[in-house]
Amino acid sequence: MMTQPQPLAFRIGLGYDSHRLGPDGPLRIGGLDVAGDFHAIGHSDADVLLHAVTDALMGAIAGPDIGRLFPDDADENRGRDSRDFVEEALRRVNEAGYEINNVDAVILAQKPKMAPHIDSMRAAVAEMLQTTIEQVGLKAKTGEGVDAVGRSEAIAARAVVMLSRR
């Protein structure tokens, strides 16, 4: 007779997203509009940071990815605010009996410069996740002229989350 496994005390999830960039701003990232010469092209608001965080949360609970939760061919997701995605992922994390220990993310963008916006983005993400700002790490890196990010043709983000059993 097989016994039911005990729920894991900790779970880790990894998320990634990228979008092509188009002319004219603003760029929506971390739930904020960042002024600049570019905007991300996508079916929703194309917020790469929130998409990566959503996938990290869903991955940590072995849930479906953002594309299965919010298909890009569904009309209701056209122009949709990515905060909705984070909200649904957080609801599922809570429903699974977990809470967020911390989130760490990196934004990959040549332009616009992210450094002036990092603290505001950390605060916005912490509020969305119902955590403290100390639980949200965020960095930004440029592409140094290499690949689509470095040529300002794309923007990307990676996120990792650690959950603990409540």
From Swiss-Prot:
Alphabetically list the UniProt keywords.
Isoprene biosynthesis, Lyase, Metal-binding
Q: Which GO terms describe its biological process?
A: isopentenyl diphosphate biosynthetic process, methylerythritol 4-phosphate pathway; terpenoid biosynthetic process
Requisite cofactors: a divalent metal cation
Which pathway does the record list? Isoprenoid biosynthesis; isopentenyl diphosphate biosynthesis via DXP pathway; isopentenyl diphosphate from 1-deoxy-D-xylulose 5-phosphate: step 4/6
Q: What is its EC number?
A: 4.6.1.12
Q: Which GO terms describe its molecular function?
A: 2-C-methyl-D-erythritol 2,4-cyclodiphosphate synthase activity; metal ion binding
* Note on how the cofactor is bound: Binds 1 divalent metal cation per subunit.
Q: Which Gene3D superfamilies does the entry link to?
A: 2-C-methyl-D-erythritol 2,4-cyclodiphosphate synthase
Q: Which domain of life is it from?
A: Bacteria
Q: Where along this sequence does the record place binding of a divalent metal cation? A: D17, H19, H51
Cystine crosslinks: none
Q: Which SUPFAM superfamilies does this UniProt record tie to the protein?
A: IpsF-like (SSF69765)
- Please give the PANTHER family that the UniProt record associates with this protein: 2-C-METHYL-D-ERYTHRITOL 2,4-CYCLODIPHOSPHATE SYNTHASE, CHLOROPLASTIC
Say which family it is in: Belongs to the IspF family.
Q: What does this protein do?
A: Involved in the biosynthesis of isopentenyl diphosphate (IPP) and dimethylallyl diphosphate (DMAPP), two major building blocks of isoprenoid compounds. Catalyzes the conversion of 4-diphosphocytidyl-2-C-methyl-D-erythritol 2-phosphate (CDP-ME2P) to 2-C-methyl-D-erythritol 2,4-cyclodiphosphate (ME-CPP) with a corresponding release of cytidine 5-monophosphate (CMP).
Subunit text: Homotrimer.
Protein's name according to its UniProt entry:
2-C-methyl-D-erythritol 2,4-cyclodiphosphate synthase
> What organism does the record attribute this protein to?
Rhodopirellula baltica (strain DSM 10527 / NCIMB 13988 / SH1)
